Design a protein with these regions (language model features):
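C-terminal catalytic/acceptor-binding lobe
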Residues: 5-22, 29-31, 46, 194-295
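Conserved catalytic core of nucleotide-sugar-dependent glycosyltransferases
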Residues: 98, 127-220
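Conserved donor nucleotide-binding strand/loop of the catalytic core
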Residues: 81-96
Length: 295
């Protein structure tokens, strides 16, 4: 007979965090405004593909923040033939690196009063039907009693903590394709200087909070998989920060987007989420390790 205490379910830990933070579930409401900050810098072919995928669906606005140098790229916002999406604003010469562009985009969308605040980079391509599926994630989570702070249609198997009915609970959702509920976007913007994490610190975070092990091995020059502490870009800190404020990050099953620049298998990118594979990525519940052996 096993006398060891049963580990709490991930969903129960999430509900506890919500209670502590005082967050509440919210489904999208009629009249809610959705805006995406699209970041671009040259790479016109990538930007066109991103726009074509986005524009398959409507119901949202785009605030386009461009840092391009080339004349062709700078001209694109004025000539792209939008059919469904609404181009609300174009801002040129948004420079200083990706984090400055991200913060500018979040701040601008919040200033404009959007209820849902999104980020899309110009190297992600969505499938038709992506937008209603994205918005439905907030409703699916709310039906489970989950306060969804961030949702994505670009889902990697290795970033899933748990598969639910119709959606995944994720441990990592980056800036390439993400939609925040407005209060969650305000948290991220306010906490942006505190988002820095490394592979070791993010592993410790999830081991302590959710009792899951993240296998964040990387390949060295000889092709061998090794465990090493690597500094991560700031967007890796989005999801941990949201959990600490009572918000959950979720994704579609299956993934409805693909990355143009980095293929699946690139640094910490596993295969995209598919419906027939459950928790096939890099996350496992923790075994009862002896003291001192936890990450």
């Amino acid at each position: 007979m096993n006398s060891s205490p049963q580990q709490p379910a991930i969903i129960d830990i999430i509900r506890y965090l919500q209670t502590q933070a005082g967050t509440v579930c919210r489904r999208p409401q009629l009249g809610d405004r959705v805006g995406f900050a699209l970041s671009s810098k040259d790479r016109v072919d990538f930007t066109r593909q991103t726009l074509e995928g986005m524009d398959a669906d409507g119901g949202y606005d785009i605030v386009w923040n461009d840092g391009s140098d080339g004349a062709e790229a700078r001209a694109l916002p004025g000539i792209f033939p939008f059919r469904n999406a609404r181009l609300a604003e174009v801002n040129y010469d948004v420079r200083g690196g990706p984090d400055r562009s991200i913060c500018f985009g979040l701040q601008r969308l919040i200033q404009l009063g959007y209820d849902y605040v999104g980020l899309i980079e110009n190297d992600v391509v969505m499938q038709p039907g992506w937008f209603p599926r994205l918005m439905n994630l907030f409703a699916l989570a709310a039906a489970d009693g989950i306060a969804c702070g961030a949702a994505t249609v670009r889902s990697y198997e290795g970033r899933v903590m748990e598969h639910r009915a119709g959606y995944s609970v994720n441990w990592g959702t980056g800036a390439g394709m993400i939609l925040f509920a407005r209060p969650a976007a305000e948290v991220i913007l306010h906490q942006y200087p505190r988002l820095q994490m490394s592979t070791a610190s993010i592993m410790r975070f999830y081991a302590r909070l959710f009792k899951v092990d993240l296998n964040m091995c990387v390949q060295n020059g000889e092709g061998k998989w090794i465990q090493q502490d690597s500094r991560l870009t700031l967007d890796w800190g989005y999801t941990p920060m949201l959990y600490m404020h009572g918000y959950t990050s979720v994704g579609t099953i299956p993934s409805l987007a693909r990355d143009l620049e980095f293929p699946a298998g690139h640094f910490l990118l596993s295969d995209y989420v598919r419906p027939e594979r459950f928790n096939a990525g890099l996350v496992r519940r923790r075994s009862a390790l002896p003291p001192g052996q936890h990450p």
